[in-house]
Amino acid sequence: MTAFLIVLVVAAEAYLLGSVDTGILVSKYLYHDDVRTHGSGAAGMTNMLRTFGKKAAALTAVGDVLKGVVAVCLGRWLFGHLPADAAVSPYLGVYLAAILAVVGHSRPIYFGFKGGKGVLVAAGAILAVQPVLLPVLALIFLVCLVPTGMVSLGSITMAAAYPVLTLVYSLMRGLPTRDVVVCTVGAAIMGGMVIWMHRSNIQRIRDGKEYRFGQKHRSN
């Protein structure tokens, strides 16, 4: 396959896979309801926990993380078929897949382009790309979550820290400049998307009205 065709295939598989929204499927087929009509309106783990409980949240979390992992692994495998003389960073495939999986999750083609915020899908992608960064990101998340009870604040801070950690880690590994740029820009896009999807949460934090972990909302 040509490099252009491989890029298209990676983008398509990641977006379509990301569009398989676990939270929506679990809420519809196990609870005969749509999680997007409750709480924050998002189809993510936190809203599933508030609305349907721990089992629903756990199933959603596992499905969302796996989407990120599988999308990136497929992207990496497909980019392995690039011609030997292709002047393309091998990291382009994994970050393209990661970004499009998050896009698919937040704007799923199968569910009216309204999904979740992509945090766990991004976490799954990071697990497949840079597993060494996950403990650091998890620590950042907990440092924000524990004193405030705000999952959203932890997610936003973690998303902001991810490109910085990626840059530092890429430089420490001695990657070529081309790969450092691809990794850092890819991480910045992923982090920026997650922050953008939390813009309503940011406003609620400013207003002192953000949901706290453990609160349960069954209606808007």
Can you name each region flagged by the protein language model?
Residues 24-57, 115, 203-220:
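Cytosolic, membrane-interface loops and tails of multi-pass inner-membrane proteins
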Residues 23-26, 102-114, 140-149, 198-203:
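C-terminal ends of transmembrane helices
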Residues 49-54, 75-79, 100, 118-148, ...:
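Interfacial segments of multi-pass membrane proteins
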Residues 135-137, 151-159, 177-187:
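Loop-to-transmembrane alpha-helix initiation sites
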Residues 175, 182-220:
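C-terminal membrane-associated helical module and adjoining short loops/tails
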